[in-house]
């Protein structure tokens, strides 16, 4: 039996500056955050080519709250992440924050089972909405 995740996955992308080594190949940087129901980042990854840069960015974000600490997250990235991709990473984070604002985390909808999911007792997991 597979358990349903209790987290949300958000992604954001932004253009890389011209002076980044892998800009010619990829043009954009991607950021993906896995966030729990309280808004806390539990996992993070980027499309940055260097493992040390990706790992550093992960350490900056894991444990931070995307609902309550947005300004602090951005300030931390701007202060600590001194690589050429800094601006693109911040832009990608802004796109993630916009996606969070449209999710059950920010809209106040219950974050229970996904619409149409089967509840453990075999019943419907929630009302399905279309629109």
Where are these regions (language model features)?
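Short, compositionally biased leader-like segments
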Residues: 1-13, 127-131
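Short polar catalytic/cofactor-binding loops
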Residues: 13-19
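Active-site- and interface-proximal helix/loop "cap" or "latch" segments in soluble metabolic
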Residues: 19-131
